[in-house]
Amino acid sequence: MASSSWAFFKVFNPQIAPKSISHIGQSDLMQLTHKKQLPTFQRRGIAEDSLLPSSTTPIKPMHVETKHTRTMGDIFVQHSQKLELFRNVLRNAAELDALEGLNMIDAVQRLGIDYHFQREIDEILHKQMGIVSACDDLYEVALRFRLLRQHGYFVPEDVFNNFKDSKGTFKQVLGEDIKGLMSLYEASQLGTEGEDTLVEAEKFSGHLLKTSLSHLDRHRARIVGNTLRNPHRKSLASFMARNFFVTSQATNSWLNLLKEVAKTDFNMVRSVHQKEIVQISKWWKELGLVKELKFARDQPLKWYTWSMAGLTDPKLSEERVELTKPISFVYLIDDIFDVYGTLDDLILFTEAVNRWEITAIDHLPDYMKICFKALYDMTNEFSCKVYQKHGWNPLRSLKISWASLCNAFLVEAKWFASGQLPKSEEYLKNGIVSSGVNVGLVHMFFLLGQNITRKSVELLNETPAMISSSAAILRLWDDLGSAKDENQDGNDGSYVRCYLEEHEGCSIEEAREKTINMISDEWKKLNRELLSPNPFPATFTSASLNLARMIPLMYSYDGNQSLPSLKEYMKLMLYETVSM
């Protein structure tokens, strides 16, 4: 059995014990909890979050479904054999046909199972660097460009100059090549600041693809529409994989084999996630905060989805469980600042977090004492685990992250207590910190335990651009959701509202367009950071990217202020079994 499969086997076994969780149907995922009564100066859509499952919405355990009754050992042996078979097929195909190798890598990544084939992908893409511009096929050039950039190779944008006319614009004849246009559109999502050719490529391909929708057959129109809505760079592979299953047509044997591998993988991973939810629910229930702080959100399943989306390797089970704990406290403290705390009490709470001394809680109200004590204990326990496992005490960095978060929350509380909105730039600068992204990624870095050095920790403490760009994307996406109703209270504090206040005569549509463009700019900055040398391990940078990809699912509200995409993601990852 291959080493990666054996490690997976150890994570997957044993199965979730049915008696450890209540048995309910998957429809219970959609049950709604009651909305909380909020003050009129609500900052971000807290009430809307209550539309997601709470800790009282347990998961029903499911098992891998097969056509014949087989032991788990048999399933793993067969899975390992198919993995090894596909590795050989991938190596051989890439040697014989460079484009076929790229197609196979693309399929593996779209199915979200590339962690099984990292060595093979590394070797193939390294060889592909020598032929980046030795082709006149738009599909192949764009695919190679995208896969190489995704893998950290900086391929220049001028590889697309061959597809421009004498005026320097993309040739109109390319409009007949739908497959090539989709590949070009996908490649354009890897652009960085100042890359005008890729900006033009996105506009050119996007316009022609939208135009083509009216005359394509239903199947092809679905594929094109999905490309426009969910380009691979900005989408979670785990969420889009099922769509790839439906739309990809097996024209060769390797795709059928790969789908078989992916189906088994999906079911195994789902069982791992269910096991983790049991652990998180147990921790959250024993913590008891939901009983003591009745105003706060009770949604450990939602909080866990951040960990599940960010750390996709099944072997990182312990890390996902531990990461959910600080994420839970980000939401909890956010509720204290947004929903319940008076300004005077919030000042005292922030001072206590900055001092990080248990005696600092003496003058706090009881509910704040409970929260601070729980945060203090969780952080110290977290630090001990990291030190025991990786030999580095992260407590100083963790304290800095929590203090920065509370300081940013307090700045916002003072703004809204005064009834005055800040300038949009000032709001966003503070909002990047109050997003909580830095807290989550700092904890994640130490959990992973890779390349922890004085240099990397110092950079982490200063909030590197990789983190701030992801945080800006979250803040702006969140604010787009809270600004959907132009008749809402003007003190909600979204970037859109700050921008409207600052620019007299600007319409809400113009302000939203400005926000959308800023999100695009932050993606370009994030792309640049992921291509630039940095001291962070690949697992961490990949998780940072996945966090940015997760954001639209977390903040895309519908007309009922519900989150249909997030609910669908939870259902796919935690409930639905892929038929074997």
Swiss-Prot record:
One of its GO terms (molecular function) is magnesium ion binding. It catalyses: (2E,6E)-farnesyl diphosphate + H2O = (3S,6E)-nerolidol + diphosphate. Mg(2+) 1 binds at residues 334, 338. It is found in: Plastid, Chloroplast. It comes from the Eukaryota. Its cofactor is Mg(2+); Mn(2+). Its EC number is 4.2.3.48. Its main location: plastid. One of its GO terms (cellular component) is chloroplast. Pathway: Secondary metabolite biosynthesis; terpenoid biosynthesis. InterPro entries: Isoprenoid_synthase_dom_sf, Terpene_cyclase-like_1_C, Terpene_cyclase_plant_C1, Terpene_synth_N, Terpene_synth_N_sf, Terpene_synthase-like, Terpene_synthase_metal-bd, Terpenoid_cyclase/PrenylTrfase. Transmembrane segments: none annotated. Residues 1-31 form a transit peptide. Mg(2+) 2 binds at residues 334, 338. Keywords: Chloroplast, Lyase, Magnesium, Manganese, Metal-binding, Plastid, Transit peptide. It is an enzyme of class 4 (lyase). It holds the Pfam family Terpene_synth_C. The Asp-Asp-Xaa-Xaa-Asp/Glu (DDXXD/E) motif is important for the catalytic activity, presumably through binding to Mg(2+). Involved in monoterpene (C10) and sesquiterpene (C15) biosynthesis. Converts geranyl diphosphate (GPP) into S-linalool and farnesyl diphosphate (FPP) into (3S)-E-nerolidol. Probably not expressed in wild strawberry species. This is (3S,6E)-nerolidol synthase 1, chloroplastic.
